[in-house]
Amino acid sequence: MIKMTQTRGKGDKDNVCFADAVLNPSASFGGLYTFSTLPHLTPHILREFENLTYKELCKRVFELLDLGLSEELLEFALHTYDAFDDERTPVNLARYDENLFVLELYHGPTRAFKDMALQPFGRIVQTLAHGKDYLILVATSGDTGPATLESFAQEKLGKDCSIKVVCLYPKDGTSDVQRLQMVTQDSTNLKVLGIRGNFDDAQHTLKSLLQDSEFVGFLQSKGIELSAANSVNIGRVAFQIIYHIWAYCQLCKNGVLTRTESLNIIVPSGNFGNILGGFYAKKMGVPIGKLISASNANNILYDFLTTGVYDIRHRQLLKTSSPAMDIIKSSNVERVLFELFGAQRTKECMRSLQDKGMYALDSVELGAVQEYFAASFCNDMQCRELIAKSFAKGYLLDPHTACGIKAYEDFVKLEGGEKFVLCSTAEWSKFAPNVAEALGARNGLEDREAIEFVLSLDKKQKLSPHIAEVFEKPIVHNEVVDIAKVKNAIMQWLK
């Protein structure tokens, strides 16, 4: 069983096993836990993978990662995929054109890729907790929150569930469907707080609470341990490796790729956790060419991956039609820095970002990053045009996936004949007003009206009952607080 290592060095905290890192994701010096070693997937192993089901592949990769989870626990966790649209496989790989395949990661209960990790994650945390009381914090730009709440609701984990969840979301920073998915969750172990601020504020608050001695002491006085469900938690990231491997193996199995060809993977990126899974897959030996980060107008990742400079000093967060990517401080870049440059350099960069609002890689370091990554970005006007263009071709996109189509169009010209997979991170129905406007509806439709408009244009589309039901449920969580009052609001709830 491997130990997890720490991105900013060991400090006074020993490296821990995977289970301990899942339950307590707070590493030394404000850093993150990550894998100390990665297995090598030989061509022979990858060929064996081609004949596995998705669940079998997950179990095999976790076994090779040597994470120390029992076969019974993993089987129990992976049963959550049985409730996805197709119980045989939780994802779908759709052909978009001759060179592009769309990996649909949104067929779970909250219609976003976060279900791929967070549905099994809930059962794993519940089991590893061994009946101890835990508080799970989650900050969301719109998709992580609903997926976490769905996973940890008592109806999923049972009435004797010892885990409570507090979800922080930016009051005006999500789609209406995303908000309704959170504020209608009626389970006594769940608390949803809107904050007056943006996702970066929510994520900073979460990280601060993980390190807050007064807050941790208050929880300990009540016998409560503290954890988090964001991709600061390595347990999330582990599951996000699997579908990148699966996509490659399926394309080889179906004869689309020869085993000597590499595959380029495009990922709409905000907090960098999804594309990080692809990075680890490439490090493990999967023949991935470039990992292409697709951003919206908040294009700090584009700037970083093309110049080596991460600079937030003069940036204002812009509200876009792809709100799950409205992020400026991208947490998981830190794990890439560690993997490529080690703990000392990572610690220097993160300290510089905190103290000066920026850090810069030298030319050699930038070259190392660009061995793995490329980048593109897309503004809202381009996004609308691409939604309309794709719809005319017979494929309905959400705005985040549309940013990925822009990346494909940018790079397919340069990489003629190479194959691409685009990770589609959310179903269109979560962002229906923006999709409807792109397809000719008037601006300002409410979500339900916009959904009806889109369905009227495409009779083949069916609305997921998971989305339909949020419009009928009563709102349970009304509280909105200033950032400075989040800690007190949580403590009051737990009293």
PLM regions with names:
Residues 1-495:
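PLP-dependent amino-acid enzyme catalytic core
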